[in-house]
C-alpha cells in the first residue's frame, strides 16, 4: 500500500504523480469529446479516418484501379465477396520477387565496370590524348610548325603547369585551413561592374565578327584578365583535346553540374571560363555567381535568350555568354541542362533519332516548331496535341494590317505604342512560337493511328549484326542510309571501319573472323588515325564486356603488326587505354595488355616509348604513375633491360621530383616481378640504380626501394647475394630506425635476402632480425602481420637456424600472438599462417607443433577448426606420424572426429585432413576404426544430404587403411550398407556412395566383395542412365573395374545390356568419362568376345553426332587392340561398303586409331587394307582423303623397318596428288602422311619426288614443294647428303666434291 501523505509537500507530490500517470494512459482507449465514435473493430472493421472507403485519388489513366475491389474484408459493413487463394502461411513461404527483379540478370555477361573498385574506376577519367609528333617521320626532318602537332616539349610544359597549379591549390587549401587567407580589396575590386550591352548598342569597332588573331596559349597566359586555366582543367597527366570525338571541348569530368552562368560570373576557384576572354572584357572583374534557383522560371517555349529580359529577340543557342561577347572558337558554352529539350535537333538534320533521345511529354509539345525529325519521333498523343495547339495558335495569332483594314470601316488609324512600353509575355501566352508553315491542314482532322514510331530504324541496314543500345553512340552513322559514292574518301573509310568493328564486336564467329582478317589486311590502307580514333573510344566504353574487350584488344594486336612505325603518333593514345589492363584482376586481361604493349614497343621503338611515357613518370596522379611503371617493365622485357638501364639510372636519381624517383624504382620492382630469373645478368646494375632510395628523404621512396630490393632478391633466388652487398648496411640500419609501413618493407627485403646467404651468415642475421620480428608479432596492422609471417618462414627455412633456438625463442610468442580466431577470418592471413607453421614444423618436428594446436580441433569457431585441421594435414603429410606418442594420437583422433562431425559448411578441408591423419597413422588406427565406422554409419542415415555425402567420402578415404588393419569384415559390412543406399536420390550423394563402393572393391578384391559382384552390377546398370557428371564418372569407373577384374561373375547378356548403356555415355561432356567408357568397351570385349560388342559399335557409326562417332571409332580401335586386329578388321572393312558418308569416315577413323594403337602389329594387315585406302585417297570427298592420309601416317610409322616399303610406296603415289589442297585440315593430314612415309621408306625416295617441283615456273607449285623439302631437311638432314643429284662442273664453277667419293 502506498504511503499516506501527511505534509502539504507530500500531498502536492502525490497529486502531481497521479496527474502524470493519467497523462501517460493510452489515448487510443478513450474517445475524445470532438471525435467520432468507434465501433468494435473486430466486427465492423472501423477506421480512424472519416474518409475511409472513399476514393481519395483519381488514377492518371482513366481505368480504375481494380485491386481495391477484390481486397478481402471481414467487416459486416460493406462486406465484399472473399477471393479464393492459397493459405497465407503457404504464400509467405514463397519468396516474393521485388518489382525491379530481373530474372535474366545472372545469365547476362558481366560488364567490366561492374567489378571494378574505386581505384580501377580511375581509368574512365583518363583522357585519350591527341596525336603527338613523330620525330622520326620523313627521315627525321624538322617538323612543319603549321602542323600544330604536340611535341615532347609541349607535353612537358603542360605537365609542369599542372604540377604548379596543384601545388598552388595545395598551398591555398593549407592557408585556408590555417585561417591565413585574407580578402584583398585591390584595384580590381574598385572598378565598376561592366554594363551589359545589347547587340544594338555596339559601335562599329565592336562588331562580333572582328575577332582578333588567336593567341598562343603562352601569350594568353600573360594577357590581363585571362587565367591560364586552359590546361589546368584537365585530368593530370593526360593532355587536353583528347576527348572522344563529338564531346564538348573543355567540359571535363570534374566540372560542376552545368548551370546557367551569365557573362562575367566566374566558376568558383577556376578563373574565367577557358576560351571566353573576349577583347573588350579585359579588366572586368567577375560578378557574384548567379544561382539558377534565383532566376525567373522559364518553360521550353520561352525566349531562348541569355538570361536577359522577356522582350529580347530569340537567339539560336542557349549559351551562358552575353550577347556582346564574341564566341571564341574552342570555348565551352556553359549550358543549363534544365532549359534544353532532351534532343535539340536542327531542322535540317536527318529525320532519324537514336533511341533514348525521343522527346516525351511536355518537352516535345512545348517545341515552338518541331522539325520533321521531331514530328516523326513524337508519340501519336503528342502529335495530336501539337496539331490542336497549332490550330489554336493559328486562330489566335496577331492580325495583320490588311486583315484589320478589311474588318474595320475607314477612319481608324494605328496608334504608336507609348515610350518605354514593354509587352507582357508570360509563359502561358505562347507568343514566341515561330510561324514556320509546315503545310498542315486546319479544320477537322480524322484521328488515325500514327505509325511513325514503329518504323524508327534503330538497327543498321545490310548484312550487319544486331546493334545494342549501348553501341548506338559509337555506330550511329550506320543507322543512316546514305549513298556511299557521294561521300568523301575519309567518310567512306570511316564507315567501312565502323562496319568491320561492329561485325567484330557483335557478329557471329564466321562474320567476326572475316572482318578481323579484312581489317588486318587493310590496316595500312585505312591508316592508324581513323582506326585508333574508332577502336580506342570503344575500349573506354563503360558498358564493355570481357568478350568484347578481348576482341577489340585482338584487333589492336593484329593491326599493330601491319602498321608498324605508323603507330608512333598514337602510342600515348593506345597506352591510356591498354595500361589499365595491366592491373586488371583477370589474369588473361593482364597477359593481353602485356602483349599489346610489347608489340607496341617493338613497332614504335625505344626512343618513342621513352619520350611518350616520360611525362607520366612524375605525374601527380598515383594511378597514372602505377600503370606507367608496369608498362615500362613490359617495354624492358620486350626491348631488353640493358637498353633501358641508362634511362632508369637518370630517372631514379632525379633531383626535381620525388615522384619520378618513386616511379623509376617501381619500374625496377615491376621488371623483377615480370621477368623473374631473367634479371640475373643485370642484377648488380639494377641494385646500384635503386640503392640510394633506401636513404631517400621521402618515406614513400624508401618504402618502394625496400620492396624493389625484395622483388629483385625473390627473382634471383637462390643466387646473387654478392650483388646485394651494398644494400645490406642501409637495410640493417633501416629496420632499427623505421616503424609502420616502412619497417614492413625493410623486413620484407631482409626476409628475401636471408635465404640467399651462406649458413653462418643466415644464422647470425636471423638471430638479429628475430628480435624485431618478435616485437612486431603483436602489431595490429594486417599487412605487417603477413610480412612478419613470411619473414619468419624464410628465416626458419634456412640451413643455419637451429631447432632449439626456434623452440625456445620463437614458438611461445608465435603461438600466443598468431594462433587466434581473427587470423582464420582473413583468407590471406590464414594461408600465410598455415604455411609458416608448417615450415616451423619442418624444423622442430611434427609433435612439437601438433601438441600445441591439437586441442583447438574442438574450438567452437568452425573457421578456426578448419585452419588447425589444414595445418595438421600438411604437417603429417610432410613428416608422417613417427614422433607422435600414444596420448597425442588419442587426442588427435578424438579431435578430428569431433571436428568432422561438427562441420556445417561443405568443404573438403576436414575430409582431406581426416584421410591424411588416418593414412599417416596406418596400423595405429585399428583401435579407433569401430568408433570411426560407427560414426560413418550413423551419419549415412542423417537426413541432411551434405552429411551423408561427407560420410560416404570418408569411407573412400579410409578404405586403404582398413585393408592395412585387416578389417575386411568391417569393409564387407560397409559394402552391404552402401549397396542398400544405391537408391539415393541426391546425385552428389549417390556419386560419393559409388566412389566409396569403388574404393572398397579396389582393396577387398572381387571374390571377397559383399554384396557379390553378380548382384552389384545389375544394380549399377540403370544408374548409368544418370546424367550427373559425378555419378557418371564414379559409376563407369566401378563398372570398368569389375569388367577388368571380375567379368566372369556376370552373364554375357548383362554385359551386352551395359554396352548399350555405355553408348549414351559417349555423349558426356567430360573427357574422363568418355575415356573410361571406351576403355570399358575393351574390357567387355575381352570378357565376352569382340563380335557382339563390335556389332553394337558399328551400328553406332550411323548416328549424326560427331563426338559420338569419334568416341565409337576409338572404342573399335581399343577392341581391336584388346582382342587382336584380325577379329575386327574383316567386319570393319565390310562396313566400308555401306554407301553412307558418316559410316565410311567412321571406318577410316577407326583404322587410323587402330594402326596407331597396334603399332608394329600392323605389318600383317597392311596389304589387306591397301585397296580400301586406295579408294579413300581417290574419293571426291575431302574428309575421306584427309582421314585416309592420317591412316597412312600411323601405319607407316608403325611398320618402319619391317620391309613393307613396296606397299607404302604404292600408297605414296595416291597421297602425293593431294599436296596442292588448300583446306588447312587436309594439308595438315597430308604433310603428316609424308612425314610418316619419310621415316618408313627413307628420305631418298621423298627427295626424288620433291626435286621435280622445287624449280617449277609456277610460284604456288614451288611454295608447296619447298615446304615439303624443308620438312624432309629438318627430319633427315644428314641422310640427304648422299642423295642430292650430281651436278657436273662447268667452265667457271666446280660443283663436284671429290672427297665425298673417297672409298677406303
From Swiss-Prot:
Region of interest: Interaction with SF3B3 and SF3B5: 1248-1304
PTM sites of type N6-acetyllysine: 141, 214, 554, 562
Substitution effect: residue 254 to A: Abolishes interaction with RBM39
Annotated Pfam families: PPP2R1A-like_HEAT (PF22646), SF3b1 (PF08920)
GO molecular function, one term: RNA binding
Per UniProt, location of the Glycyl lysine isopeptide (Lys-Gly) (interchain with G-Cter in SUMO1) cross-link in this chain: 413
Outcome of substituting residue 248 to A: Slight inhibition of interaction with PPP1R8
Mutation effect (residue 257 to A): No effect on interaction with PPP1R8
Mutation effect (residue 267 to A): No effect on interaction with PPP1R8
Mutation effect (residue 261 to A): Slight inhibition of interaction with PPP1R8
Region feature Interaction with SF3B14, mapped onto this chain: 529-568
Phosphothreonine sites (modified residues): 125, 142, 203, 207, 211, 223, 227, 235, 244, 248, 257, 261, 267, 273, 278, 296, 299, 303, 313, 326, 328, 341, 350, 354, 426, 434, 436
GO cellular component: B-WICH complex; catalytic step 2 spliceosome; nuclear speck; nucleolus; nucleoplasm; nucleus; spliceosomal complex; U11/U12 snRNP
Entry-annotated residues carrying Phosphoserine: 129, 194, 229, 287, 322, 332, 344, 349, 400, 488
InterPro entries: ARM-like, ARM-type_fold, PP2A/SF3B1-like_HEAT, SF3b_su1, SF3b_su1-like
Phenotype when changing residue 200 to A: Abolishes interaction with RBM39
Site features described as Interaction with PHF5A, chain residue numbers: 592
Job description of the protein: Component of the 17S U2 SnRNP complex of the spliceosome, a large ribonucleoprotein complex that removes introns from transcribed pre-mRNAs. The 17S U2 SnRNP complex (1) directly participates in early spliceosome assembly and (2) mediates recognition of the intron branch site during pre-mRNA splicing by promoting the selection of the pre-mRNA branch-site adenosine, the nucleophile for the first step of splicing.
Family statement drawn from the similarity comment of this UniProt entry: Belongs to the SF3B1 family.
Subunit (UniProt): Component of the 17S U2 SnRNP complex, a ribonucleoprotein complex that contains small nuclear RNA (snRNA) U2 and a number of specific proteins. Part of the SF3B subcomplex of the 17S U2 SnRNP complex. SF3B associates with the splicing subcomplex SF3A and a 12S RNA unit to form the U2 small nuclear ribonucleoproteins complex (U2 snRNP). Within the SF3B complex, interacts directly (via HEAT domain) with SF3B3, SF3B5, SF3B6 and (via HEAT domain) with PHF5A. The SF3B subcomplex interacts with U2AF2. Identified in the spliceosome C complex.
Descriptive protein name: Splicing factor 3B subunit 1
Source organism of the structure: Homo sapiens
Amino acid at each position: 500500500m502506498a504511503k499516506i501523505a501527511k505534509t502539504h509537500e507530500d500531498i502536492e507530490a502525490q497529486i502531481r504523480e497521479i496527474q502524470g500517470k493519467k497523462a501517460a494512459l493510452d489515448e487510443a482507449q478513450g474517445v475524445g469529446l470532438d471525435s467520432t465514435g468507434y465501433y468494435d473493430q473486430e466486427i465492423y472493421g472501423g477506421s480512424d479516418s472519416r474518409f475511409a472507403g472513399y476514393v481519395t485519388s483519381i488514377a492518371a489513366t482513366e481505368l480504375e484501379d481494380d485491386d481495391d475491389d477484390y481486397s478481402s474484408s471481414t467487416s459486416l459493413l460493406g462486406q465484399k465477396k472473399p477471393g479464393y487463394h492459397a493459405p497465407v502461411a503457404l504464400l509467405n513461404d514463397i519468396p516474393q520477387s521485388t518489382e525491379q527483379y530481373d530474372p535474366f540478370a545472372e545469365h547476362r555477361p558481366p560488364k567490366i565496370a561492374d567489378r571494378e573498385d574505386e581505384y580501377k574506376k580511375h581509368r574512365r577519367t583518363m583522357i585519350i590524348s591527341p596525336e603527338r609528333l613523330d620525330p622520326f617521320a620523313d627521315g627525321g626532318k624538322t617538323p612543319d610548325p603549321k602542323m600544330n602537332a604536340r611535341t615532347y616539349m609541349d607535353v612537358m610544359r603542360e605537365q609542369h603547369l599542372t604540377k604548379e597549379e596543384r601545388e598552388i591549390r595545395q598551398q591555398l587549401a593549407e592557408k585556408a585551413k590555417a585561417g591565413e587567407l585574407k580578402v584583398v580589396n585591390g584595384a580590381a575590386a574598385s572598378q565598376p561592374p561592366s554594363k551589359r550591352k545589347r547587340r544594338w548598342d555596339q559601335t562599329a569597332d565592336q562588331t562580333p565578327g572582328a575577332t582578333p588573331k588567336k593567341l598562343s596559349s603562352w601569350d594568353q597566359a600573360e594577357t590581363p584578365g585571362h587565367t591560364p586555366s586552359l590546361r589546368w582543367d584537365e585530368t593530370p597527366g593526360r593532355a587536353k583535346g583528347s576527348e572522344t570525338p563529338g564531346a564538348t571541348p573543355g567540359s571535363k569530368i570534374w566540372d560542376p553540374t552545368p548551370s546557367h552562368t551569365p557573362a562575367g560570373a566566374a566558376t568558383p576557384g577556376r578563373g574565367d571560363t577557358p576560351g571566353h576572354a573576349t577583347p573588350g572584357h579585359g579588366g572586368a572583374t567577375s560578378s557574384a555567381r548567379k544561382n539558377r534557383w534565383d532566376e525567373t522560371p522559364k518553360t521550353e517555349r520561352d525566349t531562348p535568350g541569355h538570361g536577359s529580359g522577356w522582350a529580347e529577340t530569340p537567339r539560336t543557342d542557349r549559351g551562358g555568354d552575353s550577347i556582346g561577347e564574341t564566341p571564341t572558337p574552342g570555348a565551352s558554352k556553359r549550358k543549363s541542362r534544365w532549359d534544353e529539350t532532351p534532343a535539340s535537333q536542327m531542322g535540317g538534320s536527318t529525320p532519324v533519332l537514336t533511341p533514348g533521345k525521343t522527346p516525351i511529354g511536355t518537352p516535345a509539345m512545348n517545341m515552338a516548331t518541331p522539325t520533321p525529325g521531331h514530328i516523326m519521333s513524337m508519340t501519336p498523343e503528342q502529335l495530336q496535341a501539337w496539331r490542336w495547339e497549332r490550330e489554336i495558335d493559328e486562330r489566335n495569332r496577331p492580325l495583320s494590317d490588311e486583315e484589320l483594314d478589311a474588318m474595320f470601316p475607314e477612319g481608324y488609324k494605328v496608334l504608336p505604342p507609348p515610350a518605354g512600353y514593354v509587352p507582357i509575355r508570360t509563359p502561358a501566352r505562347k507568343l514566341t512560337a515561330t510561324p514556320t508553315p509546315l503545310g498542315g491542314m486546319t479544320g477537322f482532322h480524322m484521328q488515325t493511328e500514327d505509325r511513325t514510331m514503329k518504323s524508327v530504324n534503330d538497327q543498321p541496314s545490310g548484312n550487319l549484326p544486331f546493334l545494342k543500345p549501348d553501341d548506338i553512340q559509337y555506330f550511329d552513322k550506320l543507322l543512316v542510309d546514305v549513298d556511299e559514292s557521294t561521300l568523301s574518301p575519309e567518310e567512306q573509310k570511316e564507315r567501312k571501319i565502323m562496319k568491320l568493328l561492329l561485325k567484330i564486336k557483335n557478329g557471329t564467329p564466321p562474320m567476326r573472323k572475316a572482318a578481323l582478317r579484312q581489317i588486318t589486311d587493310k590496316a595500312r590502307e585505312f591508316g592508324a588515325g581513323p582506326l585508333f580514333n574508332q577502336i580506342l573510344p570503344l575500349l573506354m566504353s563503360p558498358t564493355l564486356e570481357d568478350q568484347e574487350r578481348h576482341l577489340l584488344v585482338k584487333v589492336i594486336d593484329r593491326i599493330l603488326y601491319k602498321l608498324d612505325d605508323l603507330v608512333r603518333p598514337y602510342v600515348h593514345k593506345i597506352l591510356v587505354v591498354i595500361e589499365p589492363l595491366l592491373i586488371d584482376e583477370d589474369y588473361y586481361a593482364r597477359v593481353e595488355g602485356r602483349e599489346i604493349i610489347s608489340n607496341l614497343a617493338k613497332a614504335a621503338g625505344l626512343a618513342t616509348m621513352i619520350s611518350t611515357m616520360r611525362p607520366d613518370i612524375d605525374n601527380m596522379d598515383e594511378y597514372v604513375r602505377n600503370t606507367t611503371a608496369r608498362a615500362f617493365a613490359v617495354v624492358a622485357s620486350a626491348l631488353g633491360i640493358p637498353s633501358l638501364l641508362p634511362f632508369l639510372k637518370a630517372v631514379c636519381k632525379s633531383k626535381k621530383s620525388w615522384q619520378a624517383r618513386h616511379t623509376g624504382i617501381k619500374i625496377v620492382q615491376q621488371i623483377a616481378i615480370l621477368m623473374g630469373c631473367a634479371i640475373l645478368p643485370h642484377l648488380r646494375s639494377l641494385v646500384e640504380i635503386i640503392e640510394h632510395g633506401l636513404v631517400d628523404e621521402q618515406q614513400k621512396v624508401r618504402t618502394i626501394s625496400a620492396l624493389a630490393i625484395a622483388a629483385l632478391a625473390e627473382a634471383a633466388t637462390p643466387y646473387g647475394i654478392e650483388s646485394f652487398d651494398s644494400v645490406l648496411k642501409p637495410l640493417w640500419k633501416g629496420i632499427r630506425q623505421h616503424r609502420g609501413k616502412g619497417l614492413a618493407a625493410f623486413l620484407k627485403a631482409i626476409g628475401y635476402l636471408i635465404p640467399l646467404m651462406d649458413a653462418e651468415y643466415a644464422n647470425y642475421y636471423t638471430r638479429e632480425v628475430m628480435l624485431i620480428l618478435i616485437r612486431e608479432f603483436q602489431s595490429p596492422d594486417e599487412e605487417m602481420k603477413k610480412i612478419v609471417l613470411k619473414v619468419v618462414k624464410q628465416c626458419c627455412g634456412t640451413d643455419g637456424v637451429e631447432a632449439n633456438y626456434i623452440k625456445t625463442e620463437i614458438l611461445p610468442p608465435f603461438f600466443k600472438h598468431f594462433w587466434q580466431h581473427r587470423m582464420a577470418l582473413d583468407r590471406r592471413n590464414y594461408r600465410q599462417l598455415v604455411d609458416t607453421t608448417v615450415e616451423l614444423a619442418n624444423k622442430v618436428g611434427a609433435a612439437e607443433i601438433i601438441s600445441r594446436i591439437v586441442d583447438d580441433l574442438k574450438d567452437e569457431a568452425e573457421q578456426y577448426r578448419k585452419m588447425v585441421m589444414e595445418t595438421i594435414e600438411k604437417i603429417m603429410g610432410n613428416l608422417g606420424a613417427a614422433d607422435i606418442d600414444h596420448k597425442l594420437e588419442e587426442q588427435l583422433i578424438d579431435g578430428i572426429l569431433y571436428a568432422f562431425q561438427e562441420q556445417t559448411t561443405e568443404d573438403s578441408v576436414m575430409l582431406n585432413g581426416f584421410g591424411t591423419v588416418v593414412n599417416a597413422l596406418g596400423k595405429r588406427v585399428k583401435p579407433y576404426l569401430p568408433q570411426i565406422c560407427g560414426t560413418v554409419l550413423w551419419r549415412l542415415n542423417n537426413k541432411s544430404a551434405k552429411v551423408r555425402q561427407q560420410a560416404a567420402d570418408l569411407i573412400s578415404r579410409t578404405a586403404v587403411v582398413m585393408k592395412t588393419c585387416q578389417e575386411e569384415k568391417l569393409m564387407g559390412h560397409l559394402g552391404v550398407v552402401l549397396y542398400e543406399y544405391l537408391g539415393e536420390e541426391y546425385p552428389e550423394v549417390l556419386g560419393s556412395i559409388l566412389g566409396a563402393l569403388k574404393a572398397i572393391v579396389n582393396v577387398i578384391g572381387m571374390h571377397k566383395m559383399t554384396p557379390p559382384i553378380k548382384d552389384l552390377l545389375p544394380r549399377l546398370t540403370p544408374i548409368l542412365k544418370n546424367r550427373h557428371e559425378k555419378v557418371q564418372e564414379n559409376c563407369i569407373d566401378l563398372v570398368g573395374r569389375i569388367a577388368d577384374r571380375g567379368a566372369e561373375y556376370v552373364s554375357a547378356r548383362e554385359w551386352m545390356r551395359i554396352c548399350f548403356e555405355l553408348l549414351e555415355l559417349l555423349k558426356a561432356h567430360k573427357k574422363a568419362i568418355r575415356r573410361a567408357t571406351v576403355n570399358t568397351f575393351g574390357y567387355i570385349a575381352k570378357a565376352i568376345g569382340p563380335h557382339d560388342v563390335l556389332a553394337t559399335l558399328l551400328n553406332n557409326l550411323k548416328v549424326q553426332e560427331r563426338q559420338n562417332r569419334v568416341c565409337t571409332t576409338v572404342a573399335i580401335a581399343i577392341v581391336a587392340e584388346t582382342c587382336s586386329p584380325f577379329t575386327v578388321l574383316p567386319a570393319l572393312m565390310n562396313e566400308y561398303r555401306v554407301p553412307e558418308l558418316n559410316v565410311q569416315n567412321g571406318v577410316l577413323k577407326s583404322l587410323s586409331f587402330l594402326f596407331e594403337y597396334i603399332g608394329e602389329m600392323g605389318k600383317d594387315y597392311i596389304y589387306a587394307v591397301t585397296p580400301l585406302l586406295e579408294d579413300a585417297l581417290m574419293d571426291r570427298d575431302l574428309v575421306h582423303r584427309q582421314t585416309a592420309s592420317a591412316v597412312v601416317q600411323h601405319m607407316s610409322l608403325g611398320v618402319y623397318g619391317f620391309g613393307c616399303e613396296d606397299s607404302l610406296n604404292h600408297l605414296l603415289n595416291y597421297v602425293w596428288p593431294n599436296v596442292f589442297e588448300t583446306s588447312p585440315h587436309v594439308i595438315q593430314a597430308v604433310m603428316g602422311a609424308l612425314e610418316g612415309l619419310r621415316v618408313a621408306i627413307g628420305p631418298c625416295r621423298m627427295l626424288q619426288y620433291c626435286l621435280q617441283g622445287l624449280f617449277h615456273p609456277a610460284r604456288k607449285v614451288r611454295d608447296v614443294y619447298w615446304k615439303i623439302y624443308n620438312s624432309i631437311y629438318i627430319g633427315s638432314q644428314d641422310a640427304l647428303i648422299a642423295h642430292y643429284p650430281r651436278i657436273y662442273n662447268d667452265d667457271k664453277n666446280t660443283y663436284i666434291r671429290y672427297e665425298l667419293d673417297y672409298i677406303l
